[in-house]
Regions:
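Bacterial N-terminal signal peptides that target proteins for export
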Residues: 1-10
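Central antiparallel beta-sheet cores of small beta-barrel/beta-sandwich binding domains
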Residues: 24-121
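Bacterial N-terminal signal peptides
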Residues: 9-18
Length: 121
């Protein structure tokens, strides 16, 4: 095996665990707000659970609980969808320095809402 191949394999072996660790979120109840398009911010909680390869997120706001789908945790982003009233909404939240997430949620009609999530204490 050539030295350059060995070096590349070594670098990848070190980088892979770091990238996997960066994709973890703290399980538990996160707090924050949901701001619908043209609406006021609503206090919310977000129940985040992981078991093996399964990730679940439940949004609780305005007396309703909605399960998220298509959840993807990346190093710097959290992506998911949810369907309030049957209309699909796609969210892209960015991880902040304080480990919170915030970002936009877009519906099929082009309406934009905002979600902020702060990790459990």
């Amino acid at each position: 095996m050539r030295a350059s191949h060995r070096m590349l394999i070594g670098v990848l072996a070190l980088a892979l665990p770091a990238s996997l660790a960066a994709q973890k979120m703290t399980p538990g109840t996160w707090t924050g707000t949901v701001t619908p398009p043209d609406g006021q911010a609503i206090e919310a909680t977000f129940d985040f659970r992981q078991s093996g390869d399964t990730t679940k997120l439940t949004l609780n706001a305005g007396g309703r609980a909605i399960e998220a789908s298509d959840i993807k945790v990346e190093a710097t982003r959290l992506l998911f969808s949810f369907s309030p009233g049957g209309a699909s909404v796609r969210c892209t939240l960015v991880r902040r320095d304080d480990k919170s997430y915030s970002g936009d949620c877009l519906d099929a009609q082009g309406g934009k809402g905002v979600i902020t999530m702060k990790p459990p204490a």
